[in-house]
């Protein structure tokens, strides 16, 4: 399985970079996982609704340009469906079983995802009702992808 994690902005925090690198290394036994960073749109601290939409739209164009046509897209969205780790694992396994070998997870910037990205997505998921920084979400996602492969294969890790 080829998994892309498309995310807005450059990751600067060393502890997050190290954590993500560790899980990417572990994932090499299960899938080819790549992280694709698209530039975030510079914006002032306080934005009107129209300005927020404009920022998300510009970031959305950059995101969509990175998604190949034959890719199953899963957007991480606050209003997405919440799943347990077991459900997430089963869904990833079903994608592989039914020939969806290319999967892209999309993590928006600090303002979220544009409507165009949400429309392009095949599904939207949420990791809970808490708001997490989009940078931290990368680490949470790669850990859950790793956990999913371990669950599917019945390997120890998941408790």
UniProtKB/Swiss-Prot annotation:
PANTHER family: METHYLTRANSFERASE, RIBOSOMAL RNA LARGE SUBUNIT METHYLTRANSFERASE H. S-adenosyl-L-methionine binds at residues 76, 108, 127-132. Pfam families: SPOUT_MTase (PF02590). Keywords: Cytoplasm, Methyltransferase, rRNA processing, S-adenosyl-L-methionine, Transferase. Homodimer. GO terms for molecular function: rRNA (pseudouridine-N3-)-methyltransferase activity. Its EC number is 2.1.1.177. The gene is rlmH. Its main location: cytoplasm. It is found in: Cytoplasm. The keyword Acyltransferase does not apply. It comes from Listeria welshimeri serovar 6b (strain ATCC 35897 / DSM 20650 / CCUG 15529 / CIP 8149 / NCTC 11857 / SLCC 5334 / V8). The keyword Methyltransferase applies. This is Ribosomal RNA large subunit methyltransferase H. It catalyses: pseudouridine(1915) in 23S rRNA + S-adenosyl-L-methionine = N(3)-methylpseudouridine(1915) in 23S rRNA + S-adenosyl-L-homocysteine + H(+).
């Amino acid at each position: 399985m080829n998994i892309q994690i498309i995310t807005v902005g450059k990751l600067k925090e060393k502890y997050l970079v190290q954590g993500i690198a560790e899980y990417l290394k572990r994932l090499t036994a299960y899938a080819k996982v790549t992280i694709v960073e698209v530039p975030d749109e510079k914006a002032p601290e306080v934005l009107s609704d129209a300005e927020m939409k404009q920022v998300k739209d510009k970031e959305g164009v950059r995101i969509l340009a990175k998604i190949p046509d034959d890719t199953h897209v899963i957007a991480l969205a606050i209003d997405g469906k919440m799943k347990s780790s077991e459900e997430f694992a089963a869904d990833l396994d079903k994608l592989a079983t039914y020939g969806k070998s290319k999967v892209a997870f999309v993590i928006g910037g600090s303002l979220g995802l544009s409507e165009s990205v949400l429309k392009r997505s095949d599904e939207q998921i949420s990791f809970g009702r808490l708001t997490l920084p989009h940078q931290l979400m990368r680490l949470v996602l790669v850990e859950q992808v790793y956990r999913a492969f371990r669950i599917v294969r019945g390997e120890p890790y998941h408790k």
